[in-house]
Amino acid sequence: METFRTLLAKAALGNGISSTAYDTAWVAKLGQLDDELSDLALNWLCERQLPDGSWGAEFPFCYEDRLLSTLAAMISLTSNKHRRRRAAQVEKGLLALKNLTSGAFEGPQLDIKDATVGFELIAPTLMAEAARLGLAICHEESILGELVGVREQKLRKLGGSKINKHITAAFSVELAGQDGVGMLDVDNLQETNGSVKYSPSASAYFALHVKPGDKRALAYISSIIQAGDGGAPAFYQAEIFEIVWSLWNLSRTDIDLSDPEIVRTYLPYLDHVEQHWVRGRGVGWTGNSTLEDCDTTSVAYDVLSKFGRSPDIGAVLQFEDADWFRTYFHEVGPSISTNVHVLGALKQAGYDKCHPRVRKVLEFIRSSKEPGRFCWRDKWHRSAYYTTAHLICAASNYDDALCSDAIGWILNTQRPDGSWGFFDGQATAEETAYCIQALAHWQRHSGTSLSAQISRAGGWLSQHCEPPYAPLWIAKTLYCSATVVKAAILSALRLVDESNQ
């Protein structure tokens, strides 16, 4: 297993986000502009078609991920020359698409409350394009009927403004399709690196339909595809995200922040985050981002404060709403994990448990619990262990009764081999690491002895700590942040050693 030193060096590159079939399919459509890029992406897609003919994450199954990925891949494969060259993949894909949209489909169906990022905006556009290409979508009207209301609600949030790089909808700019470019502020979409909101799929759409052949967008995409294996990640670059989450995981362990050697090791990474922190606004995924978010800002505030820096809490407070904190402006539904991380930032800032802001966040979290069990699911991560474990770390001292109940749920769901997994089937190293972090934190905080459970989990994790890791994180489709997951695992293994001492 790597060390935190080597992990942070990787995090600083910001390229730890896994490739997705959805984003890669958009790059594969660029054949008319760049044959080499298109062919590399197409090869990646065809090598990763699932046994049932669909595309997306094999585990865990997510209907929205599988539908968007398969639609995007099939649109790419049936465009121009690809259909003849990849006839076998097309035939299997057609069957998979029929099965996914059939009323007889066996498995989780569309749940708009549990959808991937921008699904209600993107899916109707892709389905319309698929129809133009002659791809049959069963029950199309039924699926679109569930999406239309949420799509309209989200677009109303824009208040008539055109989509530009300062609005979150830019991340899903392909929602405009071939005929909706009028929705876009065309000259104010690109970031300094040529991308549209650091999204390969949005950038490919831009190069195809907004500014055809745009050299800056194509250069951004080429830099990713040529440096990898032909796949395109869910987003790139994301070094602030990867650094602050790696440091947050490190901070769960018993490190001596007064040790000059430790300070020197982490100095350049803390400096990088602090240099890009904008007073009153915070940070986004990457240092050059034009859009800050409450989640990254809250975690960065927590980390910078713990390591002796002085960020301003006002950057977190700007996201405060009447009943919760928003991740982004124009957000339709709140994120539980973002509010959990706000709670951690408020604690680090010295807010008392009786402060109205703390009480507001706690009330929102209490009201958002999964029915019938003491756990929480969120729109940024598929597993309830992520949000629940982070809640225990953030809410201790604020609401110990809530934390105790959440600890009970974690203990009751530990598998006989010591691992955890929220979904039927396999347990994962990532989820097991989060649970170890929560148990170790609660053991230190409450004095409750949990060494046996932690040790059992550590034994399993030490045998299952290497990649590949399941894509449990949520963007337009599911992805994995390998650097962040490795940091969580390394943190958990350290905590196991500390618990045994």
From Swiss-Prot:
Required cofactors, per record?
Mg(2+)
Describe activity versus pH. Answer: Optimum pH is 7.5. Enzyme activity is not detected at pH values above 9.0.
**UniProt keyword Magnesium present:** yes
Enzymatic class: isomerase
Result when mutating residue 296 to V: Loss of cyclase activity
Fetch the SUPFAM superfamilies from UniProt. Answer: Terpenoid cyclases/Protein prenyltransferases (SSF48239)
Effect the entry attributes to changing residue 295 to N: Loss of cyclase activity
Q: Which GO terms describe its molecular function?
A: halimadienyl-diphosphate synthase activity; magnesium ion binding; terpene synthase activity
Q: How is its activity regulated?
A: Strongly inhibited by 15-aza-dihydrogeranylgeraniol and 5-isopropyl-N,N,N,2-tetramethyl-4-(piperidine-1-carbonyloxy)benzenaminium chloride (Amo-1618). Inhibited by GGPP concentrations higher than 50 uM.
Q: Which Gene3D superfamilies match?
A: 1.50.10.160, 1.50.10.20
Q: Which Pfam families match?
A: SQHop_cyclase_C
Temperature-related properties:
Optimum temperature is 30 degrees Celsius.
Q: Mind listing the UniProt keywords for this protein, alphabetically?
A: Isomerase, Lyase, Magnesium, Metal-binding
Q: Which GO terms describe its biological process?
A: cellular response to magnesium starvation; geranylgeranyl diphosphate metabolic process; tuberculosinol biosynthetic process
**Family assignment from sequence similarity:** Belongs to the terpene synthase family.
The name under which this protein is listed is Type B diterpene cyclase
Species this chain originates from:
Mycobacterium tuberculosis (strain ATCC 25618 / H37Rv)
